[in-house]
Amino acid sequence: METPRYRRVILKLSGEALAGSQGFGIAHEMLVTVAEQVVEIQKLGVEVALVVGGGNIWRGIAGSKQGMDRANADYMGMLATVMNALALQDAMEKAGAATRVLSAIEMRQVAEPYIRRRAIRHLEKGRVVIFAAGTGNPYFSTDTTAALRAAEIEAEAILMAKRVDGVYDSDPLKNPEAKKYDRLTFLDVLSQGLGVMDSTAASLCMDNNIPLIVFDLNKKGNIRKGIMGESIGTYVGRDK
């Protein structure tokens, strides 16, 4: 049996990734894709936690640009992540994985409150943990949530699922001449303003030496390849 390179990981899913080709809402086929791949790596003994965004339902920044109070708009975005988390939980359990949703905003009827020790214990018991409601604070992205939770649960890497197969110097969906990077440092990301994650999240990963693997979610088997240490997408670390 092959030995995974990483034993405990955070899988970061954007809301847009869950929307699939429809661009809005939750695409059932994307839920199934994620669930099947997570169950696959669980069978290798990997402990998996997910952080999910809410951009397929609501984006706080977009709301604030329309004149909404930024904090209120961000709280709406956090609630959107809870909806995505519950959809993922349903798909995971149908695929055979024991799952717990932990919310940074308390809502006991649908999720457990986020407690660091409880999250770690769930992982140790072989459950998939889904972190919902971001950090529970406005002005912080779900990328920052992924970096923060990874540091808290001592995850060995963050796997960042995207609609493109890595990090480029410009948007490959708009520029066919965009150059793809195979390896980057967090300083590269910060100094060049590459759109991998926001600066708060990148700094947190760099300070805590948490590597980032950016990959295409639509290619089946990519999560397993990333866990095994195979070269997929773009690797971002403290050093190249």
Curated annotation (Swiss-Prot):
Any one GO cellular component localisation term in the record: cytoplasm
Q: Which Gene3D superfamilies match?
A: Acetylglutamate kinase-like (3.40.1160.10)
UniProt enzyme class = transferase
Q: Where does UMP bind?
A: 54, 74, 135-142
Annotated Pfam families: AA_kinase (PF00696)
Pathways per UniProt: Pyrimidine metabolism; CTP biosynthesis via de novo pathway; UDP from UMP (UMPK route): step 1/1
Record-listed E.C. numbers: 2.7.4.22
Q: Which residues bind ATP?
A: 12-15, 55, 59, 168, 171
Q: Reaction catalysed?
A: UMP + ATP = UDP + ADP
Q: Quote the record's activity regulation.
A: Allosterically activated by GTP. Inhibited by UTP.
Q: Which GO terms describe its molecular function?
A: ATP binding; UMP kinase activity
Q: Which GO terms describe its biological process?
A: 'de novo' CTP biosynthetic process; UDP biosynthetic process
Note down the stretches annotated as region Involved in allosteric activation by GTP.
20-25
Where does it reside?
Cytoplasm
Chief subcellular location: cytoplasm
- Kindly state which keywords UniProt assigns to this record, in alphabetical order: Allosteric enzyme, ATP-binding, Cytoplasm, Kinase, Nucleotide-binding, Pyrimidine biosynthesis, Transferase
Q: How does it assemble?
A: Homohexamer.
State the protein's purpose: Catalyzes the reversible phosphorylation of UMP to UDP.
The record's family statement is: Belongs to the UMP kinase family.
Q: Record's PANTHER family?
A: URIDYLATE KINASE, URIDYLATE KINASE PUMPKIN, CHLOROPLASTIC
Give the matching NCBIfam families. Answer: pyrH_bact (TIGR02075)
Protein name (record): Uridylate kinase
Which organism's genome codes for this protein?
A: Desulfitobacterium hafniense (strain Y51)
- Lineage, broadest ranks: Bacteria, Bacillati, Bacillota, Clostridia, Eubacteriales
